[in-house]
Amino acid sequence: MDIDPYKEFGASVEVLSFLPSDFFPSNRDLLDTASALDREALESPEHCSPHHTALRQAILCWGELMNLATWVGSNLEDPASRELVVSYVNVNMGLKIRQLLWFHISCLTFGRETVLEYLVSFGVWIRTPPAYRPPNAPILSTLPETTVVRRRGRSPRRRTPSPRRRRSQSPRRRRSQSRESQC
């Protein structure tokens, strides 16, 4: 069976393969990012989005793969064979998991359309001969201001505002209250 885990999201394994393998952060960094950004949604018994479901599956698969690697490391006596297995898991399976984690975290952070546009623009850039392309690759974080603002509004990260923020907002509240009383 030829299963493409990105198909339902409008992408493909081929499109993600345009990004070089060293582009993707380590699995540990990606897992930490997923936990920091979406821990509640990932641990929730309720369905949040297809990206959250895919992230859960990728995280579970990576955990099982690490269990297998630990078992192999403990039970395979030949050091050369053990090293081959560990290397294969880290290089091949690790890259696939890093791609999956990066894609779904990016979609949740920046929006699916922005990530797909980025993948297409990077694919065009990388396939253009160096003499004819701009020197710098497209950057995913170069987003319209509205996308960044909208994302921050959806996920309350801080329970209480910082003291500096509280001070800057209190005069506004007073002004708006005084305007209401004037109307």
Swiss-Prot record:
GO terms for cellular component: host cell; host cell cytoplasm; T=4 icosahedral viral capsid. One of its GO terms (molecular function) is structural molecule activity. Phosphorylated by host SRPK1, SRPK2, and maybe protein kinase C or GAPDH. Phosphorylation is critical for pregenomic RNA packaging. Protein kinase C phosphorylation is stimulated by HBx protein and may play a role in transport of the viral genome to the nucleus at the late step during the viral replication cycle. A motif (Bipartite nuclear localization signal) lies at residues 158-175. SUPFAM superfamilies: Hepatitis B viral capsid (hbcag) (SSF47852). Residues 136-183 are annotated as: Disordered. Keywords: Capsid protein, Cytoplasmic inwards viral transport, DNA-binding, Host cytoplasm, Host-virus interaction, Microtubular inwards viral transport, Phosphoprotein, Repeat, RNA-binding, T=4 icosahedral capsid protein, Viral penetration into host nucleus, Virion, Virus entry into host cell. It is found in: Virion; Host cytoplasm. Residues 177-183 are annotated as: RNA binding. GO terms for biological process: microtubule-dependent intracellular transport of viral material towards nucleus; symbiont entry into host cell; viral penetration into host nucleus. Self assembles to form an icosahedral capsid. Most capsids appear to be large particles with an icosahedral symmetry of T=4 and consist of 240 copies of capsid protein, though a fraction forms smaller T=3 particles consisting of 180 capsid proteins. Entering capsids are transported along microtubules to the nucleus. Phosphorylation of the capsid is thought to induce exposure of nuclear localization signal in the C-terminal portion of the capsid protein that allows binding to the nuclear pore complex via the importin (karyopherin-) alpha and beta. Belongs to the orthohepadnavirus core antigen family. Homodimerizes, then multimerizes. Interacts with cytosol exposed regions of viral L glycoprotein present in the reticulum-to-Golgi compartment. Interacts with human FLNB. Phosphorylated form interacts with host importin alpha; this interaction depends on the exposure of the NLS, which itself depends upon genome maturation and/or phosphorylation of the capsid protein. Interacts with host NUP153. This is Capsid protein. It comes from Hepatitis B virus genotype C subtype ayw (isolate China/Tibet127/2002).
